[in-house]
Design a protein with these regions (language model features):
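Conserved donor sugar-nucleotide recognition element shared by glycan-biosynthetic enzymes
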Residues: 10
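Acidic, low-complexity mobile loops and tails
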Residues: 1-7
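Catalytic-site-adjacent helices and loops of nucleotide signaling machinery
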Residues: 30-31
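C-terminal catalytic/motor cores of large multi-domain enzyme assemblies
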Residues: 4, 13, 17-24, 36, ...
C-alpha cells in the first residue's frame, strides 16, 4: 500500500488542528495506542520540521558583521500576535502558489446611495461602512464561483472541499498586530447588520476580547488599506482559504463613458488566489462579476 493512502487514527479535532498548519497528518507517527495521533504529536512534528529546515540551511548567507558594528541600535520584542501569526504566514506563502489580479470597480452609485442613508426615526445620517457593501458583493460572487469558497485539504488525492457556508474574514489592524475574525453567515444578513458586526468584531480584536475560534473556519478574507492609502498590493492568502481580496483607498477619476468624461468613484481591487485550483481566466471572471455587483445595479444585485 502506498504511503499516501495510509490513514493514521486521529480525532476530527486533531485532523483539523493539523490542517490549520498545512500538515498532512498521515505523515505523523502517533504516540498513542495503535499509532493514534494526539495534539502533542502534531506540535512535535512541527518542531522537528522547523529544526530539520534550519539544519538544511547550510548555504544560508549570514551577516558578516553585527548591526551594532555600524552604529547605535535598539532591540525590541516582536508583539505576541505577530509571533503567533508568523508560522501561518510563512506556511501560506511557501505552500500556496500565489497570483494577484489587479482591477478597478466603479462604485459611484453605491457610494452616492450609502452617503444618502438616514435614520428613519432621527433623520441623522447613517454611518454604514462601505466595507459592508463589499462583503455582501463578495458573497454574491462566491455563490457563482464556488471554487473561491473552497479549501485544498487532500491535494495528493485530488480532492477539494467546497464550503456551503459564507463566513467572510475581515483583516483588522490593531495595536497588537493584524487579526482576522469572521463575519458568519453573511448571506443571511442585510447591509446594516453586517456593518454593525464589522464594528463589533473590530472592537473585540482591539480589546483582545474575542474567542480564538472566530479566527478560523472562513470562506474568503477581505483586507483593506482604505483608511491608510495606496492603491494596489499583493495580499497573502489566509490558509486554508484559496483567495483573498485586497481593497485600497477610493479614488476620484475621470472615466470615459459613451465618449464623454465623468468624474467617478473608483475602488482599487487586488485579488490573490491559489493557482493550484483557480486559473487566471476564472479569477478575471470573478473580478468582473464582483465589479458588476458593486456597480450601478448594486441595489438589485445585493438586495439592498
Amino acid at each position: 500500500m502506498s504511503d499516501k493512502k495510509i490513514k493514521v487514527p486521529a480525532s476530527p479535532k486533531i485532523r483539523k488542528f493539523a490542517r490549520e498548519f498545512g500538515i498532512n497528518i498521515n505523515k505523523i507517527v502517533g504516540s498513542e495506542r495503535k499509532g493514534r495521533v494526539i495534539e502533542s504529536d502534531v506540535k512535535n512534528f512541527i518542531t522537528n520540521q522547523l529544526n530539520k529546515d534550519s539544519s538544511l540551511n547550510e548555504n544560508k548567507i549570514n551577516n558578516e558583521f553585527a548591526h551594532s558594528d555600524f552604529g547605535e541600535i535598539e532591540l525590541k520584542d516582536i508583539p505576541r500576535i505577530k509571533k503567533l501569526a508568523a508560522p501561518y504566514l510563512v506556511n501560506s506563502w511557501t505552500t500556496i502558489p500565489h497570483v494577484t489580479n489587479h482591477d478597478e470597480a466603479d462604485i459611484t452609485e453605491m457610494e452616492d446611495f450609502r452617503n444618502s442613508l438616514t435614520d428613519i426615526y432621527t433623520g441623522e445620517k447613517k454611518k454604514i461602512s462601505p466595507l459592508a457593501f463589499i462583503v455582501k458583493a463578495l458573497v454574491a460572487s462566491l455563490k457563482k464561483f464556488p471554487n473561491f469558497n473552497s479549501s485544498i485539504d487532500d491535494i495528493e488525492n485530488g480532492k477539494i472541499t467546497l464550503k456551503k457556508y459564507f463566513h467572510i474574514g475581515i483583516a483588522v489592524d490593531t495595536p497588537h498586530g493584524l487579526m482576522v475574525p469572521k463575519i458568519r453567515n453573511v448571506n443571511n444578513k442585510n447591509i446594516n447588520h453586517i456593518s454593525n458586526e464589522l464594528k463589533k468584531v473590530s472592537e473585540q480584536c482591539k480589546n483582545l476580547k474575542i474567542n480564538k475560534k472566530e479566527f478560523f473556519g472562513g470562506s474568503m478574507t477581505i483586507t483593506s488599506l482604505g483608511g491608510i492609502g495606496g492603491s494596489f498590493f499583493t495580499p497573502i492568502i489566509n490558509y486554508p482559504e484559496v483567495a483573498i481580496l485586497g481593497i485600497a483607498r477610493l479614488e476620484k477619476k475621470q472615466i470615459s463613458i459613451n465618449n464623454k468624461f465623468y468624474l467617478r468613484t473608483i475602488l482599487p481591487l487586488s485579488l490573490s488566489y491559489d493557482h493550484r485550483i483557480i486559473d487566471g481566466a476564472e479569477a478575471a471572471r470573478f473580478n468582473n462579476d464582483l465589479k458588476e455587483n458593486l456597480g450601478k445595479n448594486f441595489a438589485y444585485k445585493l438586495a439592498v
